[in-house]
Amino acid sequence: MMKLIVTAIIFFMYSVVGFAQNWTIDGVVLDKKSNKPVEFATVILGNTEQWAVADANGKFVIKNVPSGNNVIKVSCLGYVTDEKEIIISRNITGYKAYIVEDNLTLNTVVVTAKENENSASTARTIDRTTLDHVQMLNVSDISGLLPGGTTGKPDLTDKNRFSIRTGSANEAGNPSFGTAVEVDGARLSSNASFSETKGVTTNNLSTSNVESIEVISGIPSVEYGDVGSGIVKISTKKGKTPYMVTFSSNPNTKQVSASKGFGIGKKAAVLNASVEYTKAIKNTMSPYTSYDRKQISLTYSDLFNNGGLTDKPLRLTVGLSGNLGGRDSKADPDALAGTWVKDKDNSLRANMSLNWLLSKPWITGIDLNASIVYGDKQSRERKHYSNTSSVASLHGRNEGYFVAQDYDGTDNQDIVLVPQGYSYNVMGIDDKPLTYKVGLKANWATHFGKVNNKVKLGVDWNSDKNFGTGAFTEDLATAPSFRLYDYSAQPAMNNGAVYLEDNVLIPIGKTRLNIIAGLRGEGTFINGSEYGNTYSLSPRVSAKYVVLSGKNRRNKVVRYLSFRGGYGVAVKQPPFAILYPIPSYFDIKVFNPTSTSGTAYYGYYIMPKNTLYNEDLVWQRNKQAELGMEINLAGNRISLVGYYTRTENAFEVDKSYDKFSYNYTDQTALASCGIPAANRVYSMDGKTGVVTVSDKTGVLPSEVINGKKREALTTNYYANNCGSPSNRYGLEWVIDFARIKPINTEIRLDGSFYGYKYVDYSMVEYSPTTQLMSDGTPYKYIGHYVGKSGIANGAESKRINANLTITTHIPSVRMIVSMKVEASLMRYHRYLSEGVDGAQRTYATSSSSGWLPADDPSFMDRRVLTVTYPEYYSTYDNPDELIPFKEKFLWASKNNPKLYGDLSNLCHRTVYDYYFAKDYISPYFSANFSVTKEIGDIASISFYANNFFRNLGQVYSTKTKQYSSLSSYLPAFYYGMTVRLKF
């Protein structure tokens, strides 16, 4: 044993000594056309993650480079990245890297999403050339460039979001909420939202300053947390550039922008500045509802490589971006005079990254990243109110009996009596979310013989907080009912994580195997909350096996072949809408006597219902697996990937019910009162609700009115996890045919199959508290349903989309023309209703007015009316006893008409016979046309026309057996143009 330990130590020391025998690479980066040096070019050694930045003379030096095979990548803003394989066995001096300017004079130009061929997971990149060609005005528009993606009409007046490998927004599992969005490493988060469980909106992100967008739809690195389905990484321009001015226009949106990358002094420092103004209108026929985006961005980059940092360079990048804007309908003459809606969409985003290249045997480099994102999303609406009589406006937040009073000028009245007449009032919600994140990561790249190994170890900390005050009014005297709920009083949600990942590349003969495996451990800490601390682990692994590759296969039929696969777990933190839902209030009018003087008197019982703490709440979890392959057949590149995603413990808010009683005094209780109606003065006890009538003349003694005790159910809301998972699966394909050289044309065929199925088998409660029992008292039964209280408790859908893109590039005239045909080949949806273990919860019924099952209760494959029953029901007197519903309901239909009528309020029936029918929409097509023309090096013009065939046909639905307009599925014909000037 001792010999084994000594041998291991000697081997380790030998390895370290071997690492010390490193080399130096120095060279120069040159413009291939002019042979002039390219300043600020970044040189990266891919296998060892070492880097350098070219100086004013284009020179660079990378020291302490270990022996072995490596890949040298040279990139610079405005140039095409150059990548070459090199063998390092000695010092390399005078290395010359020639890079070419990225413009339309190149023989090959790509205007589609490019596959990341070196990744073991599915990732695609959209570069600036592609973004210019499609004239992106909202970053979410790039979804149409993904396999099977469809082009939508740009509309900044609506909220735009990313949603990767998902279907409609109505699907279970909060699909868009799981898609992470980052801008230069700054995470945009919607965790601090109190209103919804959805992903971040992208309307306030500048598009003119974007250099590239990477979409990771496969298994992400463990470096990324708080994610569910996909990551979108947006990179802005960094580097020296000429002045650039852009003008974009389409019928609904106008944009103007200007940018410049300045070199600062003799240092390797650059300041990128960008300004943009975008204005969009909702409807050209009524151009008054609009959205404005006024943005300025600054990015400072610097390199410190002098003195003690000569061999250990330090690169600093600091970014600051601000946006002022939002939605406004104030000028709309079609709206009621004096009414308007204003929604702010202001933001301030700052980010910093520090990359320190150490090139030590035990560590390659350290990265420090920090970001903060602050938003001001205040919404205000001015509405017109018309009251034919006095109305009660409730604002109380304490339990008890309260009487409406005339406004006394203070802000602490429980019920304000709003007088009759007309009034205007401004109501709003003050919403100011803030997210900050700090991360520290250590990288170690080394090799063991021919095996390359890269390890990353990191920690990060992020926090979400909302500094808004919630709902408010500008005039409490005329405001409708609302309650104060201070967002800023709720605790911040903090999350800390540590992760470790190993990326190993193993040559196996002429093949190679790349394995990436990592583990992320997270803890969520919510001080001052009952949820306290929560912990989770997220393992992820991806692998890629390259079977055939290399330059020697250029003349072979099979030139490249690889297989890849992966599995990963990702955990999503909850939004504040789940952790701290806005409290609800049960307001019951308990006394409202008639008055001979016309003065209204309202007595209310207020019961606040704060959200219940759920000790069993866990964080939403996504489990994802994918298998893919890439093959090059005689120059035709084919990519195929299948995936499966399972969302577990999706966040939702559920209900439970409590029984309570209150004192109710109606008009009949005053019949025995001896005080004349004209002389009555009413008062109500705040604790008991007992009404006392006094004689305002003082002649008669006061009388206590005996009210009635009423029993009712009240609703409790609580954060919960969906008890059933949602499943998504699909297939994506991309076929890039070999370029047709005589006409310099490329053809791409891409598409996707997407499937979704979800059935909720968890037990939920529902009671129609607004209904009355047959005796006129509040409703007292609670239904316990499988999945949902509605007709269906699940759904399934399938889609097949295919796109054909033909791109012709004419380098001699610097022009590129593309046409894309988008086809929906299959669009299927169906509602489902399933009980636990095959039990039935929905039944065919023979009558549109009846609640009883038909003789043949089957329904899924028939066009019949249906009725849905709860599995059980419980009563006010014994809420813990679960009574089988169907058995009791059928018995009551024959033996107890009163019970039958009361229980029927828990049933749900369809009003048409095709609710559960399969819905196949017939195929439909659309065509888009785009052209970009460069005018020398000083200008370029792009034009597009989407749905330019103006396809206004109809589609057939197998569910309704009717035709409907394509306008519900395709955007109307629209067009746009962009002019870019460079000087």
Model-predicted regions and their roles:
Residues F304-L324, D343-E530:
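Face-selective signature of the C-terminal outer-membrane beta-barrel domain
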Residues S140-R187:
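Extracytoplasmic beta-strand/coil segments of soluble accessory domains associated
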Residues T93-Y98, V139-I142, R161-S163, E182, ...:
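N-terminal periplasmic accessory domains that precede
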Residues A186-S217:
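Short acidic/polar hinge/loop motifs at secondary-structure boundaries
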Residues I508-L513, N663-T845:
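Gram-negative outer-membrane beta-barrel transporters
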Residues N203, S212-I219, I231-F262, V275-K279, ...:
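Short strand-turn segments of transmembrane beta-barrel domains in outer membranes
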Residues V28-S34, A41-G46, K73-Y79, S89-D132:
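Short, acidic, small-residue-rich periplasmic hinge/interaction motif at the N-terminus
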Residues T647-N649, Y664, E822-V911, I921-Y924, ...:
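C-terminal beta-signal and adjacent terminal beta-strands/loops
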